[in-house]
UniProtKB/Swiss-Prot annotation:
This protein's name: Transcriptional activator protein
GO terms classed as biological process: symbiont-mediated suppression of host innate immune response
Record region (Transactivation): 120-135
Zn finger spans (unnamed): 37-54
Location of this chain's protein in the cell: Host nucleus; Host cytoplasm
Motif window: Nuclear localization signal: 17-32
UniProt keywords, alphabetically: Activator, DNA-binding, Host cytoplasm, Host nucleus, Host-virus interaction, Inhibition of host innate immune response by virus, Metal-binding, Phosphoprotein, Suppressor of RNA silencing, Viral immunoevasion, Zinc, Zinc-finger
GO molecular-function terms, A-Z: DNA binding; structural molecule activity; zinc ion binding
Keyword check for Metal-binding: yes
Disordered: annotated segments: 82-102
UniProt subunit comment: Monomer. Homodimer. Homooligomer. Self-interaction correlates with nuclear localization and efficient activation of transcription. Monomers suppress local silencing by interacting with and inactivating host adenosine kinase 2 (ADK2) in the cytoplasm. Interacts with and inhibits host SNF1 kinase. Binds to ssDNA.
Family the entry assigns: Belongs to the geminiviridae transcriptional activator protein family.
Post-translational note: Phosphorylated.
């Protein structure tokens, strides 16, 4: 009877499970932002200086105080991070009164731009439709 374990002479690629296990243990570098409404959200360290709306209020994630969670049993550290020195970076301008949402186009009952009105469509008599159905 053959042994059910694979032969040690054959080459097999490394298991993907081992790679996933290592990736899961890697610490995610993110910061926690506490909002005035009592909610909190986490943002990745590389995604700083972006804004969003929450409960009708616009928020910027460009605060100077970042709470870094390094994973494991370590307590959070408070650090002041300077913005990355990149000359092509857009300056951090976050105005809570700006509204970047485009208004909806009003719907109308007029004819579509691509189709002519129903008056311009050719009318076919009953004999035409009888020939089509009998075909």
């Amino acid at each position: 009877m053959r042994n059910s374990t694979p032969s040690k002479n054959h080459f097999s690629p490394p298991s993907i499970k081992a790679q996933h296990k290592v990736a899961k243990k890697r610490a995610i570098r993110r910061s926690r932002i506490d909002l005035s409404c009592g909610c909190s959200y986490y943002i990745h360290i590389n995604c700083r200086n972006y804004g969003f709306s929450h409960r009708g209020q616009h928020h910027c994630s460009s605060t100077q105080e970042w709470r870094l969670y390094l994973g494991g049993a370590k307590s959070p550290l408070f650090q002041d991070h300077a913005a990355p020195s990149n000359s092509s970076r857009v300056p951090d301008v976050c105005d809570p009164n700006t509204d970047n949402v485009q208004p909806r186009v009003e719907e109308s009952t007029a004819d579509a731009q691509m189709l002519p009105g129903s008056d311009a469509l050719p009318l076919f008599d009953g004999d035409f439709w009888d020939d089509i159905i009998d075909f």
